[in-house]
């Protein structure tokens, strides 16, 4: 009988996308199911996954409501224990976030094997809390910030997780002769990408021929399309859930936030990028993600608090005009990617699950 694996996720795309990738890695070898809260469901095609809704509310900062949240959490822990017993789960894999708390606590109480996943270069708070209980934690590097030295032996380094369609499309032949510019604001959106970046592009288009692929909220589609077309700028707009690999294939340069999944995809497709990390990200993890790859020579990095339209415009002009530096970054990415194959990651994850 196959082992029963439960993957816990929810919240933003940064938690959900890796969970779906792990699911696909395991579904041929194990009996796999997934839990998500209501927020995470919008990033999922429910027909593809054995999915159960397990909604967890964030802990309130209101002192009057905290006791109710505590009672609700106790209820969810007992619900988790019941779920584990009923479904005879052997291993829980958590992608982090507060929505994983009751399930991880339930796994701890029942002595169920617990594996954690940390895609960021800073250890998340939920993962830190359960580090002493877990058997292993999957990371992209041994040098994770805020990681306790005494638990370093629990790190299992794997190549960055990518959706399988990225491996099927490897013809990434790009140059800056025609500038195809991709703009990715992340699953939570970004007003700076809708305003400041858009204005910089309009100025840039006065001297360069551009084709814009921009991720934005669907409510902006008509207004953005009109603005770009009025300036004779070709554009294609898309939502977060659209197949981003199709846009990366066409892209010369990307302006992006610094979520771990997005950076992994850009690195793999050898798409040099200008990273503008979300300054309000917990523990400043987006900056640390971008900084890690910046040291490897993959990207350019700007601090949102220090840029305006002119700064961004000048940076883009400098990148476009300096083709030698651009090509060096592409080569650095190519050299980095040689170990990232679907089968290699498959073997690493499965070997950890099968460890006693």
From Swiss-Prot:
Transmembrane segments: none annotated. GO terms for cellular component: plasma membrane. UDP-N-acetyl-alpha-D-glucosamine binds at residues 12-14, 120, 163, 187, 286. It catalyses: di-trans,octa-cis-undecaprenyl diphospho-N-acetyl-alpha-D-muramoyl-L-alanyl-D-glutamyl-meso-2,6-diaminopimeloyl-D-alanyl-D-alanine + UDP-N-acetyl-alpha-D-glucosamine = di-trans,octa-cis-undecaprenyl diphospho-[N-acetyl-alpha-D-glucosaminyl-(1->4)]-N-acetyl-alpha-D-muramoyl-L-alanyl-D-glutamyl-meso-2,6-diaminopimeloyl-D-alanyl-D-alanine + UDP + H(+). Coiled coil: none annotated. One of its GO terms (molecular function) is undecaprenyldiphospho-muramoylpentapeptide beta-N-acetylglucosaminyltransferase activity. Keywords: Cell cycle, Cell division, Cell inner membrane, Cell membrane, Cell shape, Cell wall biogenesis/degradation, Glycosyltransferase, Membrane, Peptidoglycan synthesis, Transferase. It is a peripheral membrane protein. Its EC number is 2.4.1.227. InterPro entries: GlcNAc_MurG (IPR006009), Glyco_trans_28_C (IPR007235), GlycoTrans_28_N (IPR004276). It comes from the Bacteria. Pathway: Cell wall biogenesis; peptidoglycan biosynthesis. One of its GO terms (biological process) is lipid glycosylation. It is found in: Cell inner membrane. Pfam families: Glyco_tran_28_C, Glyco_transf_28. PANTHER family: GLYCOSYLTRANSFERASE (PTHR21015:SF22), UDP-N-ACETYLGLUCOSAMINE--N-ACETYLMURAMYL-(PENTAPEPTIDE) PYROPHOSPHORYL-UNDECAPRENOL N-ACETYLGLUCOSAMINE TRANSFERASE 1 (PTHR21015). Belongs to the glycosyltransferase 28 family. MurG subfamily. Cell wall formation. Catalyzes the transfer of a GlcNAc subunit on undecaprenyl-pyrophosphoryl-MurNAc-pentapeptide (lipid intermediate I) to form undecaprenyl-pyrophosphoryl-MurNAc-(pentapeptide)GlcNAc (lipid intermediate II). This is UDP-N-acetylglucosamine--N-acetylmuramyl-(pentapeptide) pyrophosphoryl-undecaprenol N-acetylglucosamine transferase. It comes from Pelagibacter ubique (strain HTCC1062). The gene is murG.
């Amino acid at each position: 009988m196959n082992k029963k694996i439960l993957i816990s996720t929810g919240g933003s795309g940064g938690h959900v996308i890796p969970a779906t990738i792990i699911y696909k890695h395991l579904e041929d070898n194990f009996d796999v199911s997934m839990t998500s809260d209501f927020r995470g469901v919008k990033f999922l095609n429910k027909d593809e996954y054995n999915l159960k809704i397990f909604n967890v509310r964030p802990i309130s900062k209101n002192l009057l409501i905290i006791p109710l949240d505590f009672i609700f959490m106790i209820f969810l822990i007992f619900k988790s224990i019941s779920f584990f017993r009923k479904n005879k789960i052997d291993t829980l894999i958590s992608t982090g976030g507060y929505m994983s708390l009751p399930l991880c606590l339930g796994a701890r109480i029942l002595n169920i094997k617990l594996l954690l996943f940390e895609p960021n270069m800073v250890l998340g708070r939920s993962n830190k809390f359960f580090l002493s209980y877990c058997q292993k934690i999957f990371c992209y590097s041994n040098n994770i910030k805020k990681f306790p030295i005494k638990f370093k032996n629990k790190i299992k380094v794997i190549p960055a997780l990518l959706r399988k369609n990225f491996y099927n499309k490897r013809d990434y032949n790009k140059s800056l002769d025609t500038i195809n510019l991709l703009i990715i604001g992340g699953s939570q959106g970004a007003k700076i990408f809708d305003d400041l970046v858009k204005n910089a592009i309009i100025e840039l288009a006065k001297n360069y021929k551009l084709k814009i692929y921009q991720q934005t909220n669907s409510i902006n589609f008509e207004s953005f399309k009109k603005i770009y077309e009025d300036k004779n700028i070709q554009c294609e707009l898309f939502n977060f859930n659209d197949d981003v690999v199709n846009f990366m294939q066409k892209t010369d340069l990307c302006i992006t936030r610094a979520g771990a999944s997005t950076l992994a995809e850009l690195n793999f497709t050898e798409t040099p990028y200008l990273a503008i990390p979300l300054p309000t990200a917990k523990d400043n993890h987006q900056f640390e993600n971008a900084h890690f790859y910046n040291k490897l020579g993959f990207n350019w990095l700007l601090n949102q608090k220090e840029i305006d339209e002119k700064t961004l415009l000048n940076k883009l002009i400098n990148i476009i005009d300096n083709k030698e530096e651009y090509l060096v970054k592409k080569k650095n990415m190519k050299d980095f990617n040689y170990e990232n194959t679907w089968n290699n990651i498959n073997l690493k994850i499965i070997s950890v699950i099968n460890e006693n």
